[in-house]
Amino acid sequence: MHYRPSPTRIIPRCSNMEILREKLSLLPDKPGVYLMKDASGQIIYVGKAKVLKNRVRSYFTGSHNGKTQLMISLIADFETIITDSEVEALLLECNLIKKHNPKYNILLRDDKTYPFITITDEAHPRILVTRQVKKGAGKYYGPYPNATAAKEAARLLNRLFPFRKCRQIPNKPCLYYHLGQCLGPCQVDVPKEAYDKIRKEAAAFLKGDQGAILKALEKKMKEASENLEFERAKEYRDLMEDLKKVGEKQNITLNDFVDRDVVGYAYTQDQLCIQIFYLRQGKLLSRDNFIFPYYEEPEEAFVSFLAQFYTESSALPQEILLPPLDISVLTKLFPMVVPQKGQKRDLVQMAMENAQTTLHEQISIEIRNLTECTQALAEIGNALGIPSLRTIESFDISNIAGTHSVAGMIQFLDGKPNRSQYRKFKIQPMPNMDDTASMHQVIERRYARLQQENLPLPDLILVDGGKGQIHAALAALHSLNAAIPVAGMVKNDKHQTSALIDAMDRIHSLDRRSAGFRLLERIQNEVHRFAITFHRQQRAKSMTLSELDGIAGVGPKRRQQLLKFFKSIDSIRQATLEELQQSGLPAPAAAAVYQHFNSHKEENHDS
Protein backbone atom coordinates (compact mmCIF):
# COMPACT_ATOMS: atom_id res chain seq x y z
CA MET A 1 0.00 0.00 0.00
CA HIS A 2 1.26 3.49 -0.83
CA TYR A 3 -0.02 6.50 1.07
CA ARG A 4 0.78 9.96 -0.21
CA PRO A 5 0.24 13.10 1.87
CA SER A 6 -1.87 15.54 -0.13
CA PRO A 7 -0.48 19.02 -0.93
CA THR A 8 -2.67 20.44 1.83
CA ARG A 9 -0.31 19.11 4.48
CA ILE A 10 2.43 21.63 3.67
CA ILE A 11 0.18 24.51 4.82
CA PRO A 12 0.68 25.22 8.52
CA ARG A 13 -2.24 24.74 10.90
CA CYS A 14 -4.27 27.87 11.39
CA SER A 15 -7.77 28.58 12.58
CA ASN A 16 -8.16 31.47 10.13
CA MET A 17 -11.05 30.73 7.75
CA GLU A 18 -9.11 32.17 4.81
CA ILE A 19 -6.44 29.51 5.22
CA LEU A 20 -9.09 26.79 5.51
CA ARG A 21 -10.73 27.98 2.29
CA GLU A 22 -7.38 27.85 0.52
CA LYS A 23 -6.79 24.30 1.77
CA LEU A 24 -10.28 23.27 0.67
CA SER A 25 -9.57 24.58 -2.84
CA LEU A 26 -6.47 22.35 -3.06
CA LEU A 27 -8.21 19.08 -2.15
CA PRO A 28 -7.63 16.29 -4.72
CA ASP A 29 -10.20 14.19 -6.67
CA LYS A 30 -8.75 11.00 -5.17
CA PRO A 31 -9.59 8.48 -2.44
CA GLY A 32 -7.99 8.91 0.95
CA VAL A 33 -8.34 9.73 4.61
CA TYR A 34 -8.92 13.08 6.32
CA LEU A 35 -7.99 14.08 9.88
CA MET A 36 -9.92 16.92 11.53
CA LYS A 37 -8.09 18.92 14.24
CA ASP A 38 -9.17 21.39 16.90
CA ALA A 39 -7.45 24.67 17.83
CA SER A 40 -4.86 22.84 19.95
CA GLY A 41 -3.88 20.56 17.07
CA GLN A 42 -5.60 17.54 18.61
CA ILE A 43 -7.11 15.08 16.10
CA ILE A 44 -10.84 14.97 16.88
CA TYR A 45 -12.14 12.97 13.91
CA VAL A 46 -10.79 10.62 11.25
CA GLY A 47 -12.78 9.74 8.14
CA LYS A 48 -12.34 8.12 4.75
CA ALA A 49 -13.51 9.30 1.35
CA LYS A 50 -13.93 7.95 -2.16
CA VAL A 51 -13.28 11.52 -3.36
CA LEU A 52 -11.50 13.65 -0.75
CA LYS A 53 -12.50 16.96 -2.32
CA ASN A 54 -16.22 16.24 -2.15
CA ARG A 55 -16.26 14.65 1.29
CA VAL A 56 -14.16 17.22 3.18
CA ARG A 57 -15.89 20.20 1.56
CA SER A 58 -19.29 18.79 2.57
CA TYR A 59 -18.48 19.53 6.23
CA PHE A 60 -18.20 23.26 5.48
CA THR A 61 -21.28 23.60 3.27
CA GLY A 62 -24.99 22.97 3.77
CA SER A 63 -26.84 22.18 7.00
CA HIS A 64 -26.02 19.45 9.52
CA ASN A 65 -27.62 17.92 12.59
CA GLY A 66 -26.78 19.30 16.02
CA LYS A 67 -24.04 16.82 16.95
CA THR A 68 -22.28 17.13 13.60
CA GLN A 69 -22.52 20.93 13.77
CA LEU A 70 -20.92 20.84 17.23
CA MET A 71 -17.97 18.83 15.90
CA ILE A 72 -17.61 21.12 12.86
CA SER A 73 -17.52 24.19 15.12
CA LEU A 74 -14.37 22.75 16.75
CA ILE A 75 -12.48 22.15 13.48
CA ALA A 76 -9.57 24.56 13.18
CA ASP A 77 -7.48 22.60 10.69
CA PHE A 78 -7.39 19.35 8.74
CA GLU A 79 -4.94 17.03 7.02
CA THR A 80 -5.52 14.57 4.21
CA ILE A 81 -3.68 11.43 3.13
CA ILE A 82 -4.16 10.19 -0.45
CA THR A 83 -4.40 6.43 -1.01
CA ASP A 84 -4.36 4.30 -4.15
CA SER A 85 -7.85 2.87 -3.59
CA GLU A 86 -10.95 2.92 -1.42
CA VAL A 87 -9.83 -0.33 0.19
CA GLU A 88 -6.56 1.24 1.32
CA ALA A 89 -8.46 4.28 2.60
CA LEU A 90 -10.75 2.03 4.63
CA LEU A 91 -7.85 0.13 6.19
CA LEU A 92 -5.90 3.34 6.89
CA GLU A 93 -8.96 4.88 8.54
CA CYS A 94 -9.17 1.86 10.89
CA ASN A 95 -5.48 2.12 11.79
CA LEU A 96 -5.58 5.88 12.42
CA ILE A 97 -8.69 5.63 14.62
CA LYS A 98 -6.97 2.94 16.66
CA LYS A 99 -3.78 5.01 16.91
CA HIS A 100 -5.26 8.44 17.72
CA ASN A 101 -8.53 7.46 19.43
CA PRO A 102 -10.27 10.68 18.27
CA LYS A 103 -13.02 12.15 20.41
CA TYR A 104 -15.72 11.87 17.74
CA ASN A 105 -14.76 8.43 16.43
CA ILE A 106 -16.45 6.32 19.07
CA LEU A 107 -16.82 3.15 17.03
CA LEU A 108 -15.24 0.19 18.79
CA ARG A 109 -12.81 2.35 20.74
CA ASP A 110 -12.48 -0.44 23.32
CA ASP A 111 -11.15 -2.91 20.72
CA LYS A 112 -13.74 -5.41 21.88
CA THR A 113 -12.72 -9.03 21.43
CA TYR A 114 -15.00 -12.01 21.78
CA PRO A 115 -14.44 -15.23 23.72
CA PHE A 116 -13.80 -18.60 22.11
CA ILE A 117 -13.79 -22.14 23.50
CA THR A 118 -10.64 -24.06 22.67
CA ILE A 119 -9.75 -27.73 23.01
CA THR A 120 -6.01 -27.46 23.54
CA ASP A 121 -3.43 -29.43 21.56
CA GLU A 122 -1.62 -30.48 24.75
CA ALA A 123 -0.75 -34.13 25.34
CA HIS A 124 -3.46 -34.09 28.02
CA PRO A 125 -5.95 -31.59 26.53
CA ARG A 126 -8.09 -29.09 28.41
CA ILE A 127 -11.22 -27.05 27.67
CA LEU A 128 -10.47 -23.32 27.97
CA VAL A 129 -12.27 -20.03 27.38
CA THR A 130 -9.99 -17.50 25.70
CA ARG A 131 -10.11 -14.22 23.79
CA GLN A 132 -6.79 -14.86 22.04
CA VAL A 133 -6.72 -17.14 18.98
CA LYS A 134 -3.19 -18.55 18.68
CA LYS A 135 -2.13 -20.68 15.75
CA GLY A 136 -1.21 -24.23 16.75
CA ALA A 137 -2.53 -23.91 20.31
CA GLY A 138 -5.68 -25.94 19.73
CA LYS A 139 -9.02 -26.11 17.95
CA TYR A 140 -11.19 -23.00 18.45
CA TYR A 141 -14.97 -22.75 18.49
CA GLY A 142 -16.90 -19.49 18.47
CA PRO A 143 -16.76 -16.61 18.88
CA TYR A 144 -19.35 -16.42 21.63
CA PRO A 145 -21.02 -13.02 22.07
CA ASN A 146 -20.10 -12.80 25.76
CA ALA A 147 -18.01 -14.54 28.41
CA THR A 148 -21.06 -15.87 30.25
CA ALA A 149 -22.24 -17.86 27.23
CA ALA A 150 -18.73 -19.23 26.61
CA LYS A 151 -18.20 -20.20 30.26
CA GLU A 152 -21.61 -21.89 30.42
CA ALA A 153 -20.78 -24.02 27.39
CA ALA A 154 -17.28 -24.82 28.74
CA ARG A 155 -18.72 -25.82 32.12
CA LEU A 156 -21.12 -28.22 30.43
CA LEU A 157 -18.33 -29.65 28.27
CA ASN A 158 -16.16 -30.30 31.32
CA ARG A 159 -19.03 -32.17 32.97
CA LEU A 160 -19.76 -34.22 29.85
CA PHE A 161 -16.21 -35.13 28.84
CA PRO A 162 -13.26 -36.18 31.06
CA PHE A 163 -10.75 -33.58 29.88
CA ARG A 164 -7.90 -32.53 32.19
CA LYS A 165 -9.03 -29.82 34.61
CA CYS A 166 -5.78 -28.98 36.44
CA ARG A 167 -3.43 -26.35 35.02
CA GLN A 168 -0.46 -28.51 36.00
CA ILE A 169 -0.64 -32.27 36.47
CA PRO A 170 -0.59 -32.89 40.25
CA ASN A 171 1.25 -35.62 42.12
CA LYS A 172 -1.93 -37.34 43.26
CA PRO A 173 -5.48 -37.73 41.92
CA CYS A 174 -7.86 -34.83 42.41
CA LEU A 175 -11.61 -34.84 43.04
CA TYR A 176 -12.42 -34.73 39.31
CA TYR A 177 -10.72 -38.11 38.81
CA HIS A 178 -12.80 -39.69 41.56
CA LEU A 179 -15.97 -38.14 40.05
CA GLY A 180 -15.14 -39.61 36.65
CA GLN A 181 -14.70 -36.15 35.10
CA CYS A 182 -10.98 -36.61 34.35
CA LEU A 183 -9.05 -39.53 32.85
CA GLY A 184 -6.39 -39.06 35.52
CA PRO A 185 -3.03 -38.54 33.76
CA CYS A 186 -1.61 -38.02 37.26
CA GLN A 187 -2.58 -41.62 38.09
CA VAL A 188 -2.38 -43.64 34.86
CA ASP A 189 -0.90 -43.42 31.38
CA VAL A 190 -3.80 -42.20 29.25
CA PRO A 191 -3.55 -43.45 25.65
CA LYS A 192 -3.80 -40.89 22.84
CA GLU A 193 -6.79 -42.75 21.42
CA ALA A 194 -8.82 -42.00 24.56
CA TYR A 195 -8.28 -38.27 24.15
CA ASP A 196 -8.94 -38.44 20.39
CA LYS A 197 -12.33 -40.01 21.14
CA ILE A 198 -13.49 -37.32 23.58
CA ARG A 199 -12.03 -34.59 21.34
CA LYS A 200 -14.21 -35.85 18.50
CA GLU A 201 -17.31 -36.07 20.70
CA ALA A 202 -16.75 -32.59 22.17
CA ALA A 203 -16.25 -31.13 18.68
CA ALA A 204 -19.56 -32.67 17.58
CA PHE A 205 -21.26 -31.09 20.58
CA LEU A 206 -19.80 -27.66 19.78
CA LYS A 207 -20.99 -28.03 16.19
CA GLY A 208 -24.54 -28.58 17.40
CA ASP A 209 -24.78 -32.38 17.19
CA GLN A 210 -26.32 -33.28 20.55
CA GLY A 211 -28.30 -36.36 19.57
CA ALA A 212 -25.55 -38.92 20.15
CA ILE A 213 -24.61 -37.38 23.52
CA LEU A 214 -28.23 -37.37 24.71
CA LYS A 215 -28.62 -41.05 23.77
CA ALA A 216 -25.42 -41.98 25.60
CA LEU A 217 -26.49 -40.06 28.71
CA GLU A 218 -29.94 -41.65 28.66
CA LYS A 219 -28.35 -45.10 28.47
CA LYS A 220 -26.04 -44.32 31.41
CA MET A 221 -28.96 -42.93 33.42
CA LYS A 222 -30.97 -46.15 32.94
CA GLU A 223 -27.98 -48.32 33.84
CA ALA A 224 -27.34 -46.33 37.01
CA SER A 225 -31.00 -46.55 37.97
CA GLU A 226 -31.06 -50.31 37.41
CA ASN A 227 -27.98 -50.63 39.63
CA LEU A 228 -29.77 -48.56 42.32
CA GLU A 229 -27.22 -45.74 41.90
CA PHE A 230 -29.89 -43.09 42.13
CA GLU A 231 -27.56 -40.14 42.84
CA ARG A 232 -25.55 -40.92 39.71
CA ALA A 233 -28.76 -41.37 37.72
CA LYS A 234 -29.89 -37.93 38.90
CA GLU A 235 -26.59 -36.41 37.73
CA TYR A 236 -27.10 -37.87 34.25
CA ARG A 237 -30.67 -36.58 34.20
CA ASP A 238 -29.51 -33.07 35.17
CA LEU A 239 -26.87 -33.15 32.45
CA MET A 240 -29.49 -34.09 29.87
CA GLU A 241 -31.72 -31.22 31.00
CA ASP A 242 -28.84 -28.73 30.77
CA LEU A 243 -28.01 -30.03 27.31
CA LYS A 244 -31.60 -29.63 26.16
CA LYS A 245 -31.70 -26.06 27.51
CA VAL A 246 -28.68 -25.17 25.40
CA GLY A 247 -30.45 -26.66 22.39
CA GLU A 248 -33.63 -24.69 23.12
CA LYS A 249 -31.70 -21.40 23.02
CA GLN A 250 -30.54 -22.17 19.47
CA ASN A 251 -33.99 -21.94 17.91
CA ILE A 252 -33.04 -20.26 14.61
CA THR A 253 -31.09 -22.60 12.35
CA LEU A 254 -29.74 -23.03 8.84
CA ASN A 255 -29.13 -26.61 7.82
CA ASP A 256 -25.78 -26.02 6.11
CA PHE A 257 -23.92 -25.82 9.50
CA VAL A 258 -21.95 -22.75 8.34
CA ASP A 259 -20.52 -20.16 10.76
CA ARG A 260 -21.92 -16.78 9.76
CA ASP A 261 -22.79 -13.33 11.09
CA VAL A 262 -25.98 -11.56 10.07
CA VAL A 263 -25.81 -7.76 10.27
CA GLY A 264 -28.57 -5.17 10.14
CA TYR A 265 -28.74 -1.45 10.90
CA ALA A 266 -31.17 1.39 11.55
CA TYR A 267 -30.63 5.12 12.02
CA THR A 268 -32.16 8.41 13.04
CA GLN A 269 -30.91 11.87 12.15
CA ASP A 270 -27.89 11.51 14.44
CA GLN A 271 -27.75 7.96 15.86
CA LEU A 272 -26.87 4.64 14.24
CA CYS A 273 -27.80 1.22 15.63
CA ILE A 274 -26.11 -1.95 14.37
CA GLN A 275 -27.37 -5.42 15.24
CA ILE A 276 -25.28 -8.57 14.71
CA PHE A 277 -26.66 -12.11 14.92
CA TYR A 278 -24.02 -14.79 15.54
CA LEU A 279 -24.85 -18.11 13.86
CA ARG A 280 -22.39 -20.90 14.54
CA GLN A 281 -22.74 -24.26 12.82
CA GLY A 282 -26.00 -22.93 11.44
CA LYS A 283 -27.51 -22.12 14.85
CA LEU A 284 -28.18 -18.71 16.35
CA LEU A 285 -26.10 -18.40 19.52
CA SER A 286 -26.77 -14.77 20.42
CA ARG A 287 -26.73 -11.19 19.21
CA ASP A 288 -24.98 -7.90 19.91
CA ASN A 289 -26.04 -4.25 19.66
CA PHE A 290 -23.99 -1.12 18.99
CA ILE A 291 -25.52 2.37 19.20
CA PHE A 292 -23.51 5.55 18.56
CA PRO A 293 -23.72 9.01 16.94
CA TYR A 294 -22.42 9.37 13.39
CA TYR A 295 -20.99 12.35 11.48
CA GLU A 296 -21.23 11.25 7.85
CA GLU A 297 -23.82 9.47 5.72
CA PRO A 298 -25.31 6.55 7.69
CA GLU A 299 -24.29 4.02 5.01
CA GLU A 300 -20.68 5.28 5.16
CA ALA A 301 -20.68 5.06 8.97
CA PHE A 302 -22.04 1.50 8.68
CA VAL A 303 -19.26 0.49 6.28
CA SER A 304 -16.60 2.06 8.54
CA PHE A 305 -18.01 0.16 11.51
CA LEU A 306 -17.89 -3.16 9.66
CA ALA A 307 -14.29 -2.56 8.59
CA GLN A 308 -13.18 -1.77 12.14
CA PHE A 309 -15.20 -4.58 13.69
CA TYR A 310 -13.94 -7.34 11.41
CA THR A 311 -10.38 -6.02 11.18
CA GLU A 312 -10.19 -6.47 14.96
CA SER A 313 -11.92 -9.87 14.91
CA SER A 314 -9.81 -12.77 16.17
CA ALA A 315 -11.44 -15.20 13.73
CA LEU A 316 -13.76 -14.36 10.86
CA PRO A 317 -16.90 -16.41 10.23
CA GLN A 318 -17.22 -18.17 6.90
CA GLU A 319 -19.88 -15.74 5.72
CA ILE A 320 -21.22 -12.30 6.71
CA LEU A 321 -24.73 -11.44 5.50
CA LEU A 322 -25.54 -7.75 4.93
CA PRO A 323 -28.53 -5.66 3.87
CA PRO A 324 -28.64 -4.17 0.35
CA LEU A 325 -25.95 -1.49 -0.07
CA ASP A 326 -22.71 -0.97 -1.98
CA ILE A 327 -20.24 -3.35 -0.31
CA SER A 328 -17.75 -3.59 -3.18
CA VAL A 329 -14.97 -2.22 -0.96
CA LEU A 330 -15.77 -4.62 1.89
CA THR A 331 -15.97 -7.75 -0.28
CA LYS A 332 -12.30 -7.28 -1.17
CA LEU A 333 -11.43 -7.66 2.52
CA PHE A 334 -14.06 -9.88 4.10
CA PRO A 335 -16.44 -12.75 3.12
CA MET A 336 -19.48 -10.45 2.87
CA VAL A 337 -22.55 -11.01 0.71
CA VAL A 338 -25.99 -9.42 0.22
CA PRO A 339 -28.52 -12.28 -0.01
CA GLN A 340 -31.26 -11.74 -2.59
CA LYS A 341 -33.80 -14.36 -1.52
CA GLY A 342 -34.66 -17.19 0.83
CA GLN A 343 -33.92 -17.73 4.51
CA LYS A 344 -30.67 -15.75 4.45
CA ARG A 345 -32.47 -12.64 3.21
CA ASP A 346 -35.14 -13.21 5.88
CA LEU A 347 -32.44 -13.32 8.56
CA VAL A 348 -31.00 -10.01 7.35
CA GLN A 349 -34.48 -8.50 7.43
CA MET A 350 -34.91 -9.79 10.98
CA ALA A 351 -31.61 -8.15 11.97
CA MET A 352 -32.78 -4.87 10.38
CA GLU A 353 -36.11 -4.99 12.25
CA ASN A 354 -34.35 -5.77 15.54
CA ALA A 355 -31.97 -2.85 14.99
CA GLN A 356 -34.94 -0.54 14.43
CA THR A 357 -36.69 -1.82 17.58
CA THR A 358 -33.52 -1.50 19.69
CA LEU A 359 -32.90 2.05 18.47
CA HIS A 360 -36.50 3.06 19.19
CA GLU A 361 -36.25 1.61 22.71
CA GLN A 362 -32.95 3.41 23.31
CA ILE A 363 -34.37 6.75 22.22
CA SER A 364 -37.43 6.24 24.44
CA ILE A 365 -35.18 5.48 27.42
CA GLU A 366 -33.01 8.54 26.72
CA ILE A 367 -36.07 10.80 26.51
CA ARG A 368 -37.43 9.38 29.76
CA ASN A 369 -34.06 9.75 31.51
CA LEU A 370 -33.64 13.30 30.21
CA THR A 371 -37.11 14.22 31.44
CA GLU A 372 -36.43 12.73 34.88
CA CYS A 373 -33.00 14.40 35.16
CA THR A 374 -34.45 17.78 34.15
CA GLN A 375 -37.23 17.38 36.70
CA ALA A 376 -34.80 16.26 39.43
CA LEU A 377 -32.49 19.24 38.92
CA ALA A 378 -35.45 21.62 38.89
CA GLU A 379 -36.73 20.20 42.21
CA ILE A 380 -33.33 20.52 43.91
CA GLY A 381 -32.78 23.97 42.40
CA ASN A 382 -36.19 25.20 43.54
CA ALA A 383 -35.60 23.92 47.09
CA LEU A 384 -32.25 25.73 47.35
CA GLY A 385 -33.10 28.81 45.27
CA ILE A 386 -30.77 27.97 42.37
CA PRO A 387 -32.52 28.97 39.11
CA SER A 388 -30.26 27.10 36.68
CA LEU A 389 -28.72 23.91 38.05
CA ARG A 390 -26.57 21.73 35.78
CA THR A 391 -23.27 20.88 37.50
CA ILE A 392 -23.16 19.39 41.00
CA GLU A 393 -19.95 18.44 42.81
CA SER A 394 -20.17 16.32 45.95
CA PHE A 395 -17.50 15.57 48.59
CA ASP A 396 -17.11 12.87 51.24
CA ILE A 397 -14.36 12.38 53.84
CA SER A 398 -13.32 8.82 54.70
CA ASN A 399 -11.02 7.65 57.52
CA ILE A 400 -10.78 5.33 60.50
CA ALA A 401 -10.21 7.13 63.79
CA GLY A 402 -8.54 9.95 61.86
CA THR A 403 -5.97 7.71 60.13
CA HIS A 404 -5.47 7.31 56.37
CA SER A 405 -7.80 10.28 55.91
CA VAL A 406 -8.85 10.83 52.29
CA ALA A 407 -11.63 12.55 50.38
CA GLY A 408 -13.54 11.69 47.26
CA MET A 409 -15.19 14.16 44.91
CA ILE A 410 -17.67 13.26 42.19
CA GLN A 411 -19.35 15.43 39.58
CA PHE A 412 -22.84 15.04 38.13
CA LEU A 413 -23.55 16.93 34.92
CA ASP A 414 -27.18 17.29 33.84
CA GLY A 415 -28.15 14.63 36.35
CA LYS A 416 -25.60 12.03 35.19
CA PRO A 417 -22.17 10.99 36.56
CA ASN A 418 -19.33 12.80 34.79
CA ARG A 419 -16.58 10.35 35.71
CA SER A 420 -13.82 12.18 33.88
CA GLN A 421 -14.17 14.88 36.58
CA TYR A 422 -14.03 12.56 39.60
CA ARG A 423 -11.15 13.49 41.92
CA LYS A 424 -9.32 11.87 44.86
CA PHE A 425 -7.60 13.79 47.67
CA LYS A 426 -5.11 12.67 50.29
CA ILE A 427 -5.71 14.85 53.34
CA GLN A 428 -2.53 16.65 54.41
CA PRO A 429 -2.12 15.98 58.17
CA MET A 430 -2.30 19.02 60.48
CA PRO A 431 -2.85 19.54 64.23
CA ASN A 432 -6.45 18.96 65.40
CA MET A 433 -7.41 17.55 62.02
CA ASP A 434 -11.04 16.38 62.06
CA ASP A 435 -13.65 15.92 59.32
CA THR A 436 -14.58 19.62 59.20
CA ALA A 437 -10.94 20.70 58.90
CA SER A 438 -10.45 18.03 56.23
CA MET A 439 -13.45 19.35 54.31
CA HIS A 440 -12.08 22.92 54.51
CA GLN A 441 -8.73 21.74 53.12
CA VAL A 442 -10.21 19.75 50.25
CA ILE A 443 -12.67 22.47 49.17
CA GLU A 444 -9.88 25.04 49.23
CA ARG A 445 -7.56 22.83 47.17
CA ARG A 446 -10.22 21.94 44.62
CA TYR A 447 -11.48 25.43 43.84
CA ALA A 448 -8.14 27.20 44.12
CA ARG A 449 -7.03 24.83 41.35
CA LEU A 450 -10.07 25.62 39.20
CA GLN A 451 -9.48 29.35 39.66
CA GLN A 452 -5.79 29.04 38.76
CA GLU A 453 -6.66 27.13 35.57
CA ASN A 454 -9.59 29.44 34.78
CA LEU A 455 -12.02 26.51 34.68
CA PRO A 456 -15.78 26.80 35.31
CA LEU A 457 -17.10 26.41 38.85
CA PRO A 458 -20.03 24.10 39.66
CA ASP A 459 -23.57 25.35 40.26
CA LEU A 460 -23.82 23.52 43.60
CA ILE A 461 -21.54 21.82 46.14
CA LEU A 462 -23.01 18.97 48.17
CA VAL A 463 -21.17 17.71 51.25
CA ASP A 464 -21.93 14.35 52.80
CA GLY A 465 -22.40 15.74 56.29
CA GLY A 466 -24.16 18.28 58.49
CA LYS A 467 -23.76 21.90 59.56
CA GLY A 468 -20.08 21.61 60.53
CA GLN A 469 -18.97 20.47 57.10
CA ILE A 470 -21.23 22.98 55.33
CA HIS A 471 -19.72 25.91 57.24
CA ALA A 472 -16.19 24.54 56.72
CA ALA A 473 -16.84 24.45 52.97
CA LEU A 474 -18.30 27.99 53.03
CA ALA A 475 -15.27 29.30 54.95
CA ALA A 476 -12.91 27.78 52.38
CA LEU A 477 -14.88 29.31 49.52
CA HIS A 478 -14.95 32.69 51.29
CA SER A 479 -11.15 32.66 51.51
CA LEU A 480 -11.08 32.21 47.72
CA ASN A 481 -13.79 34.82 47.04
CA ALA A 482 -15.74 32.04 45.31
CA ALA A 483 -19.52 32.28 45.50
CA ILE A 484 -20.86 28.73 45.11
CA PRO A 485 -24.02 27.49 46.87
CA VAL A 486 -23.32 24.73 49.42
CA ALA A 487 -25.75 22.22 50.92
CA GLY A 488 -25.44 19.11 53.04
CA MET A 489 -27.08 15.72 52.51
CA VAL A 490 -28.66 14.70 55.80
CA LYS A 491 -29.01 11.02 56.72
CA ASN A 492 -31.53 9.39 59.03
CA ASP A 493 -30.90 6.80 61.77
CA LYS A 494 -30.64 4.07 59.12
CA HIS A 495 -27.85 5.97 57.34
CA GLN A 496 -30.17 6.73 54.41
CA THR A 497 -30.58 10.05 52.59
CA SER A 498 -33.43 11.97 54.21
CA ALA A 499 -33.18 15.73 53.45
CA LEU A 500 -31.05 18.71 52.41
CA ILE A 501 -29.66 21.36 54.76
CA ASP A 502 -28.61 24.69 53.28
CA ALA A 503 -26.06 27.36 54.28
CA MET A 504 -28.65 29.00 56.56
CA ASP A 505 -29.14 25.68 58.42
CA ARG A 506 -32.62 25.30 56.95
CA ILE A 507 -33.88 21.76 56.36
CA HIS A 508 -35.45 21.02 52.97
CA SER A 509 -37.35 17.74 52.84
CA LEU A 510 -38.09 16.21 49.45
CA ASP A 511 -40.74 13.63 48.66
CA ARG A 512 -39.00 10.24 48.75
CA ARG A 513 -40.84 9.30 45.56
CA SER A 514 -39.69 12.42 43.69
CA ALA A 515 -37.04 12.59 40.95
CA GLY A 516 -35.06 15.12 43.02
CA PHE A 517 -34.86 12.79 46.01
CA ARG A 518 -33.77 9.85 43.84
CA LEU A 519 -30.99 11.97 42.33
CA LEU A 520 -29.76 13.10 45.77
CA GLU A 521 -29.78 9.51 46.99
CA ARG A 522 -27.78 8.42 43.97
CA ILE A 523 -25.23 11.20 44.45
CA GLN A 524 -24.82 10.41 48.15
CA ASN A 525 -24.36 6.69 47.52
CA GLU A 526 -21.91 7.32 44.69
CA VAL A 527 -19.68 9.78 46.56
CA HIS A 528 -19.62 7.47 49.60
CA ARG A 529 -18.66 4.51 47.40
CA PHE A 530 -15.95 6.50 45.64
CA ALA A 531 -14.41 7.88 48.86
CA ILE A 532 -14.46 4.64 50.84
CA THR A 533 -12.98 2.67 47.94
CA PHE A 534 -10.06 5.12 47.78
CA HIS A 535 -9.65 4.92 51.56
CA ARG A 536 -9.48 1.12 51.47
CA GLN A 537 -6.92 1.22 48.67
CA GLN A 538 -4.70 3.60 50.64
CA ARG A 539 -5.05 1.59 53.84
CA ALA A 540 -4.22 -1.69 52.09
CA LYS A 541 -1.23 -0.09 50.39
CA SER A 542 0.02 1.29 53.71
CA MET A 543 -0.38 -2.07 55.45
CA THR A 544 1.43 -3.81 52.63
CA LEU A 545 4.36 -1.41 52.67
CA SER A 546 4.61 -1.52 56.47
CA GLU A 547 4.85 -5.31 56.37
CA LEU A 548 7.95 -4.96 54.19
CA ASP A 549 9.52 -2.33 56.47
CA GLY A 550 12.68 -3.26 58.27
CA ILE A 551 13.86 -5.94 55.85
CA ALA A 552 17.57 -5.49 55.22
CA GLY A 553 18.36 -4.31 51.70
CA VAL A 554 14.72 -3.53 50.85
CA GLY A 555 14.07 0.20 50.66
CA PRO A 556 11.12 2.13 49.20
CA LYS A 557 12.06 1.47 45.56
CA ARG A 558 12.48 -2.26 46.07
CA ARG A 559 9.22 -2.45 48.03
CA GLN A 560 7.44 -0.88 45.06
CA GLN A 561 9.33 -3.22 42.73
CA LEU A 562 8.09 -6.26 44.67
CA LEU A 563 4.50 -5.03 44.69
CA LYS A 564 4.57 -4.31 40.98
CA PHE A 565 5.88 -7.81 40.23
CA PHE A 566 3.80 -9.88 42.70
CA LYS A 567 0.69 -7.63 42.89
CA SER A 568 -0.06 -8.45 46.56
CA ILE A 569 1.64 -9.07 49.90
CA ASP A 570 0.22 -12.61 49.99
CA SER A 571 1.99 -13.46 46.74
CA ILE A 572 5.26 -12.07 48.14
CA ARG A 573 4.77 -14.06 51.34
CA GLN A 574 4.28 -17.31 49.38
CA ALA A 575 7.06 -16.73 46.83
CA THR A 576 10.05 -19.04 46.59
CA LEU A 577 13.59 -17.72 46.74
CA GLU A 578 13.93 -18.20 42.99
CA GLU A 579 10.72 -16.25 42.29
CA LEU A 580 11.92 -13.38 44.50
CA GLN A 581 15.12 -13.19 42.49
CA GLN A 582 13.08 -13.24 39.25
CA SER A 583 11.39 -10.03 40.42
CA GLY A 584 14.72 -8.25 39.99
CA LEU A 585 15.97 -8.28 43.59
CA PRO A 586 19.66 -9.03 44.10
CA ALA A 587 20.35 -12.36 45.79
CA PRO A 588 21.03 -10.95 49.32
CA ALA A 589 17.83 -8.86 49.31
CA ALA A 590 15.79 -11.77 47.95
CA ALA A 591 17.19 -14.00 50.69
CA ALA A 592 16.31 -11.39 53.34
CA VAL A 593 12.70 -11.18 52.11
CA TYR A 594 12.40 -14.96 51.98
CA GLN A 595 13.85 -15.32 55.47
CA HIS A 596 11.52 -12.60 56.82
CA PHE A 597 8.39 -14.46 55.75
CA ASN A 598 9.59 -18.02 56.27
CA SER A 599 11.62 -17.96 59.49
CA HIS A 600 8.57 -18.81 61.62
CA LYS A 601 7.86 -21.84 59.41
CA GLU A 602 11.37 -23.13 59.96
CA GLU A 603 11.06 -22.53 63.72
CA ASN A 604 7.77 -24.44 63.83
CA HIS A 605 9.32 -27.26 61.86
CA ASP A 606 12.31 -27.45 64.21
CA SER A 607 10.05 -27.56 67.26
Curated annotation (Swiss-Prot):
Keywords: Cytoplasm, DNA damage, DNA excision, DNA repair, Excision nuclease, SOS response. GO terms for cellular component: cytoplasm; excinuclease repair complex. Residues 211-246 form the UVR domain. One of its GO terms (biological process) is SOS response. Disulfide bonds: none annotated. SUPFAM superfamilies: C-terminal UvrC-binding domain of UvrB, GIY-YIG endonuclease, RuvA domain 2-like. The keyword Cytoplasm applies. GO terms for molecular function: DNA binding; excinuclease ABC activity. It is found in: Cytoplasm. It comes from the Bacteria. The UvrABC repair system catalyzes the recognition and processing of DNA lesions. UvrC both incises the 5' and 3' sides of the lesion. The N-terminal half is responsible for the 3' incision and the C-terminal half is responsible for the 5' incision. Belongs to the UvrC family. Interacts with UvrB in an incision complex. This is UvrABC system protein C.
